[in-house]
């Protein structure tokens, strides 16, 4: 059975109620299925909040956070520290054996600089499956932040959707991207059940898919092509539907290769 990577995003980390529902759903799924699970997360809302408190600017370019050298340590602390350990704490509350990691642990994901104009922002590439496979076989739930390391040891902020895609390629895993929205919406605000690359290009050209959603859709399309199977984009808000989603039932938008 392929491992399942669940990428968490949006304002989920700000809501105890949402985290309680999510981990209850994870607990329920793990009790009934033997499928190995991994969590990949960002934490943009936590980073934005911290930047505001420190009176530091938040700049995004094409949906990606610009990360100057003087901000990467702060962002690493927010993502690999606060966000990661918050999720680890929720796993512990639910008696789930979990391990908090970043992309650089065990060279699970290789990272290269994406664009000098973005600063410490990295591009994720498949890495070594050895560490994560060892943890999964021992029954652990890896919880992985989207902070990576270059071969030169430079800290890099990686878009969490792209990080999850690289991990899925590393492990041959299925992938679900959970966010604030119920899926990709058309121009009338209605959920699109299935999405192809051609349809995505049309909606981007029409200005219906914009900013961070372009990054998410492109990451999902890339994952579907790389893995040779569909990738789901769905909301964490409907916790009662999550066990079905984890079991392969589409509740959001299914991205087709």
Curated annotation (Swiss-Prot):
Q: Which Gene3D superfamilies match?
A: Acetylglutamate kinase-like
Pfam families referenced in this protein's UniProt entry, alphabetically: AA_kinase (PF00696)
Pathway(s) annotated for this protein in UniProt: Amino-acid biosynthesis; L-arginine biosynthesis; N(2)-acetyl-L-ornithine from L-glutamate: step 2/4
Biological processes per GO annotation? arginine biosynthetic process via ornithine; L-arginine biosynthetic process
Which key words are in the record?
Amino-acid biosynthesis, Arginine biosynthesis, ATP-binding, Cytoplasm, Kinase, Nucleotide-binding, Transferase
Q: Where does ATP bind?
A: 180-185, 208-210
The signal sequence is none
List the protein's name: Acetylglutamate kinase
